[in-house]
């Protein structure tokens, strides 16, 4: 089961809603996944989904809050590995015109009906109604990527005006959703893990929220470990390269003039470095008599390298 499907199934089990919340949630579902039909001079409205849980939720809301008794039709999807398609058809006999006005899909002016592409302010007046609306929009046209791979949550709609309205509603919760056009659709999206967590909280997907948070924590830990390993690897590489360079310089001096020509403090360090090529500067310093600190050992080895360079240049 995809993470997106898991979130939607969880959201469909949301606690009971009151009439105003039901209006907001159903309005969003109908706006993003419904089709208004006008045949034989009659209005019909079709809601289509591939998710059985969403179809059952719509059926329940229509029955309990609007007194509309309809049926869920199941259509086999012939495409390979595709889910069934669930269709809820609301006819004029079932009061579709009244429903469409109540949920803000159509508006009437002097007996003329027209589609309302905005989110009616009257159905999102309270906080719970706003949350219900965003929840419905996610159920109808939302999706979320597998957080193991990437952080991306989006809503798909076909009207730019509506997309901007929905984005503004989402952003009223201190989020930063953006709107882009993709072919013939408008996409409202969030890409930051923390903001996606906040949106899951808004729509009531608390179990999915915790799962995403766990993934975020694990990814952050892995990234921190990787950064630490990379840093230590880089430091180790520098240390090894420096040790190799020091040993080569000491051996060159030994061949050219002999280590006996070096001052005693440099000769002692040179002999220890040849004998212990893998030891750190701090450990080499402890072996000297008297002991010398890391910076002191480093200074002496730099002087040895400088002497080797001068010998190579014939100075």
Swiss-Prot record:
The protein's name in its UniProt record: Probable cell division protein WhiA
Gene name per UniProt: whiA
Keywords, in A-Z order: Cell cycle, Cell division, DNA-binding
Xref: SUPFAM superfamilies: Homing endonucleases
UniProt function note: Involved in cell division and chromosome segregation.
GO function term, MF aspect, one: endonuclease activity
Family note: Belongs to the WhiA family.
Statement: the UniProt record of this protein carries the keyword Cytoplasm: no
Pfam families: HTH_WhiA, LAGLIDADG_WhiA, WhiA_N
Lineage start: Bacteria, Bacillati, Bacillota, Clostridia, Eubacteriales
DNA-binding region (UniProt annotation): 280-313
Xref: NCBIfam families: DNA_bind_WhiA
Domain of life: Bacteria
Biological processes, Gene Ontology terms: cell division; regulation of sporulation
Species of origin: Clostridium botulinum (strain Hall / ATCC 3502 / NCTC 13319 / Type A)
Stored InterPro entries: Homing_endonucl, Intein_endonuc_central, Sporu_reg_WhiA_N_dom, Sporulation_regulator_WhiA, Sporulation_regulator_WhiA_C, WhiA_LAGLIDADG_dom
Cytoplasm found in the keyword field: no
């Amino acid at each position: 089961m995809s993470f997106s499907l898991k979130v939607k199934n969880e959201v469909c089990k949301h606690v009971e809603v009151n009439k105003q919340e039901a209006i907001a949630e159903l309005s969003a579902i109908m706006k993003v996944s419904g089709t208004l039909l006008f045949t034989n001079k009659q209005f019909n409205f079709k809601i289509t989904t591939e998710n059985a849980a969403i179809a059952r939720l719509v059926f329940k809301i229509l029955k309990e809050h609007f007194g509309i008794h309809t049926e869920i039709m199941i259509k086999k999807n012939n495409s390979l590995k595709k889910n069934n398609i669930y269709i809820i058809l609301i006819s004029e006999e079932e009061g579709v015109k009244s429903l469409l006005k109540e949920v803000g899909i159509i508006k009437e002016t002097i007996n003329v009906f027209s589609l309302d592409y905005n989110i009616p302010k009257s159905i999102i007046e309270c906080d719970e109604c706003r949350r219900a609306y965003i929840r419905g929009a996610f159920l109808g046209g939302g999706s979320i990527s597998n957080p193991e791979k990437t952080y991306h949550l989006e809503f798909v709609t076909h009207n730019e005006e509506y997309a901007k309205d929905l984005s503004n509603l989402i952003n009223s919760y201190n989020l930063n959703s953006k709107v882009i056009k993709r072919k013939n659709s408008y996409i409202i999206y969030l890409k930051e893990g923390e903001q996606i967590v906040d949106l899951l909280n808004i729509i009531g997907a608390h179990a999915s929220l915790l799962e995403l948070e766990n993934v975020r924590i694990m990814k952050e830990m892995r990234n921190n470990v990787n950064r630490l390993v990379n840093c230590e690897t880089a430091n180790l590489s520098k240390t090894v390269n420096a040790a190799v360079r020091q040993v080569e310089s000491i051996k060159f001096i030994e061949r050219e003039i002999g280590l006996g020509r070096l001052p005693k403090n440099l000769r002692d360090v040179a002999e220890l470095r040849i004998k212990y090529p893998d030891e750190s500067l701090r450990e080499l310093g402890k072996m000297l008599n008297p002991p010398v600190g890391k910076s002191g050992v480093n200074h002496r080895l730099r002087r040895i390298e400088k002497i080797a360079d001068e010998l190579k240049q014939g100075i």
